[in-house]
């Protein structure tokens, strides 16, 4: 299944369907979900990173129960915006997961999303390191997914 740009992916959604956002890390996959009006992304859970098939089974339950119509995965571009080995791996992983889940997918730049969330949790939320570790992945997924939502709105210019 091909990967879609934000506007095309949004246009594939049926009314009332949600979008699932993933921020895959080496140990944890942050999971976020949009509301049905596609205005707001909220953190959902952090999944332990396992083999693709195992994670796909866990995510398939969310897809079914939450009426998810599309998947957006964080793309770890290099700081200069180039498409390096990590971005290639994320793209391949996203395509494979999209096929397993049977829903269309797209990628969205996740550069510095975890850093931005960590800064917020330290400065504004005054969270301890242990508590931050519990929530940073799912919050980074929500941060990334909100960026995708904002860019994919019909009035937003096409940038991808």
UniProtKB/Swiss-Prot annotation:
It is found in: Cytoplasm. SUPFAM superfamilies: Ribonuclease H-like. Gene3D superfamilies: YqgF/RNase H-like domain. GO terms for cellular component: cytosol. The keyword Hydrolase applies. Belongs to the YqgF nuclease family. Its EC number is 3.1.-.-. One of its GO terms (biological process) is rRNA 5'-end processing. GO terms for molecular function: nuclease activity. InterPro entries: RNaseH-like_sf (IPR012337), YqgF (IPR005227), YqgF/RNaseH-like_dom (IPR006641), YqgF/RNaseH-like_dom_sf (IPR037027). Coiled coil: none annotated. This is Putative pre-16S rRNA nuclease. Keywords: Cytoplasm, Hydrolase, Nuclease, Ribosome biogenesis. Could be a nuclease involved in processing of the 5'-end of pre-16S rRNA.
């Amino acid at each position: 299944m091909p990967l879609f740009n934000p506007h095309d992916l949004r246009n594939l959604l049926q009314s009332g369907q949600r979008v699932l956002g993933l921020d895959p890390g080496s140990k944890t996959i942050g999971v976020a979900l949009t509301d049905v009006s596609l205005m707001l992304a909220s953190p959902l859970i952090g999944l332990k990173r396992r083999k693709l098939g195992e994670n796909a089974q866990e995510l398939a339950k969310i897809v079914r129960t939450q009426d998810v119509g599309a998947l957006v995965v964080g793309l770890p571009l290099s700081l200069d915006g180039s498409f390096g080995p990590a971005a290639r791996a994320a793209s391949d992983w996203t395509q494979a997961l999209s096929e397993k889940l049977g829903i269309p997918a797209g990628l969205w730049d996740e550069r510095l999303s975890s850093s931005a969330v960590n800064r917020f949790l330290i400065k504004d939320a005054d969270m301890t390191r242990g508590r931050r570790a519990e929530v940073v992945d799912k919050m980074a997924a929500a941060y990334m997914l909100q960026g995708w939502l904002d860019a994919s709105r019909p009035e937003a210019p096409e940038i991808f």
